[in-house]
Amino acid sequence: MLCLQEAHTEFLPAELGPLSLADSTKTNRLGLALYYRRERFENPESKTFALKKGMHDILFSPTNERLLATKLFDKEAGREIIAASFHASPLTARNSLRRNQIKAAHEALTAIGEGLPAVMVGDYNYPLFTGRLVKHVAKSGYDLTLSDRRTYLRYKIFRGHFDFVTSSGVTIEKVETLPQGVSDHLPILVTGHVERVGE
């Protein structure tokens, strides 16, 4: 799967090689989108969610859709899973607001499919005090996994892990930071798996 943030969604193709566009946000500036591999996944059902707003959201609206979640059937595992693209409020907001958004996002994923394996990838904008965030997401039944290298290098003060993954019921094997492209954030590659039905 491919999770995007800050994309120009109006220009995204419906097909990207072996990938199909499950859905994208259409009414805001955050440009979330999710592609899935057709040969492995099918029957995508997507939904966008608004999360608690900060001052940045009020001044630079529209930023209402901060979560795009897609439920798909994983043909290899023989079960449904949830994948999500997420974008938290920027550093002008407090960590407490981002924790609130992350918690609300996890609750939204549960509402889509309680008990289903879920993985949420994106720009968490949480480079400092991630140890506290690990404990916070654990209360929701989620694990937090950082990548092997920092994902944002633009500002000396705020360099760090901005982009990472939270998951529930998914074994995350590794998260790698890839070489920088045109974005100011470095992309990450998440490798993981869910158990097959019957295992």
For each feature predicted by the language model, list its residue ranges:
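Second-shell loop/turn segments in exported
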Residues: 1, 89-95
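Structured beta-strand-rich core segments of catalytic domains in phosphoester-bond hydrolases
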Residues: 1-80, 178-179
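Short catalytic-loop micro-motif centered on adjacent basic/acidic residues
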Residues: 1-4, 119-123
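Active-site metal-binding loops of divalent metal-dependent hydrolases
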Residues: 7, 86-88, 122-124, 186
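Soluble or luminal CAZymes and related metallo-dependent hydrolases
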Residues: 27, 61-65, 96-104, 157, ...
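Conserved hydrophobic/aromatic beta-strand scaffold that supports enzyme active sites
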Residues: 32-34, 67-71, 85, 163-165, ...
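His/acidic metal-ligating clusters that form di-metal
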Residues: 69-84, 96-121, 130-135
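Metal-dependent phosphoester-hydrolase catalytic domains
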Residues: 109-117, 124-199
